[in-house]
């Protein structure tokens, strides 16, 4: 059974929907598909905005990321927001009409990792736009009701879509143990580095140093809260003695320099996707008793993201530098090549 009423008025849901699909490496194609229906415990969301992530661009250009290979047509996009259009059995029909930010994960709630609260590590995870699971560059998607997070009317759909990369920043800052007075080094001033910079400041860091080889990106980092920016080719990164280092670049040199930059008993967090294997300065890690960990997506971060944005502690709207229609998704996937680009967003549905 699917409820399809809003405030007592019938909602006409289309039988078919649009999707912009990656049909082969470097080629997107608009197709028409049957509209999905929410299962028990799920909601149907009318997509309004989808942020373009570096992983989307990587699948578009390369057809794979590590073990995840695109072997059949795939709908990209996992940073999404919209409005609930229908609900499945077991979901309060009063949720229909709610504006939501989508946490694009479908874990198995019975797995040991999910039961431990680490559902992001669930081995049976179905994650949007990770082969073979389709993403959100389409008119409608279904998601577990608990993963469609209500957003305040003051939050734009574009900002709500970017709760996803913001959640990566939150998870990174949590792993780094950032608190009031922390000194933090962040390598990489791309979208993840920028949201992590904002989160670090919101968590109380008094010094946030952002390292990037691109001058324009360093300027962006300053705009979004970095206290200092450095060019790693021209500055001595290793002598910084910070409390925590977060790598959002994936660059081998940045990781090695960053590890050297951490004071004894400090923390190293690896977020950026780089080489599968890199040489590590093991004596530095051992002798300083550094804690080195990774971040894989996020868990239980959406309420924090909503609170930070609603309070004005994090600015997501200003990160959007380019907007495209669903039909222009292919252009959106290469927008990161535009000088000054921070984040491209695909507007699937206009208005509210």
Locate the predicted segments by residue:
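Short N-terminal strand-loop motif that marks the start
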Residues: 1-79, 349-352
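C-terminal hydrophobic helical "lid"/dimerization subdomain
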Residues: 2-19, 256, 299, 303-352
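Glycine-rich beta-strand-centered segment in the early N-terminal region that forms part
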Residues: 36-50, 65-112, 152-154
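NAD(P)H dinucleotide-binding glycine-rich loop of Rossmann-like/cofactor-binding domains
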Residues: 106-187
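Glycine-rich cofactor phosphate-binding loops and adjacent beta1-alpha1 units
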Residues: 219-291
């Amino acid at each position: 059974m699917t409820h399809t009423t809003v405030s007592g008025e019938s909602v006409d849901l289309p039988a078919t929907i649009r999707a912009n699909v990656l049909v082969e490496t470097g080629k997107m194609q608009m197709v028409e598909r049957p509209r999905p229906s929410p299962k028990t415990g799920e909601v149907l969301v009318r997509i309004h905005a989808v942020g373009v992530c570096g992983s989307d661009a990587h699948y578009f250009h390369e057809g794979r990321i590590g073990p995840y290979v695109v072997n059949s047509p795939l709908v990209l996009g996992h940073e999404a927001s919209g409005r609930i259009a229908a609900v499945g059995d077991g979901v309060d029909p009063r949720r229909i009409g709610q504006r939501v930010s989508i946490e694009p994960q479908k874990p198995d709630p019975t797995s040991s990792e999910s039961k431990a609260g680490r559902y992001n590590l669930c081995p049976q995870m179905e994650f949007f736009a990770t082969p073979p699971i389709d993403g959100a560059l389409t008119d409608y998607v279904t998601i577990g009701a608990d993963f469609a997070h209500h957003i305040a009317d003051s939050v734009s759909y574009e900002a709500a879509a970017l709760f996803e990369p913001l959640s990566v920043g939150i998870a990174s800052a949590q792993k780094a143990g950032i608190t009031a007075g922390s000194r933090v080094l962040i390598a990489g001033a791309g979208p993840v580095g920028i949201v992590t910079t904002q989160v670090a400041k919101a968590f109380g860091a008094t010094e946030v140093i952002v390292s990037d080889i691109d001058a324009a990106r360093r300027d962006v980092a300053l705009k979004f809260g970095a206290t200092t920016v450095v060019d790693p080719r021209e500055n001595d990164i290793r002598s910084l003695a910070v409390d925590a280092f977060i790598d959002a670049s994936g660059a081998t040199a940045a990781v090695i320099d960053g590890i050297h930059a951490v004071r004894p008993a400090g923390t190293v967090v690896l977020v950026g996707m780089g080489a599968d294997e890199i040489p590590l300065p093991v004596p530095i890690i051992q002798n300083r008793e550094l804690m080195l960990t990774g971040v894989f997506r996020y868990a239980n971060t959406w309420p924090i993201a909503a609170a930070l944005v609603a309070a004005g502690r994090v600015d997501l709207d200003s990160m959007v530098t380019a907007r495209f229609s669903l039909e222009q998704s292919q252009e959106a996937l290469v927008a990161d090549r535009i000088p000054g680009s921070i984040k491209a967003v695909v507007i699937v549905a206009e208005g509210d």
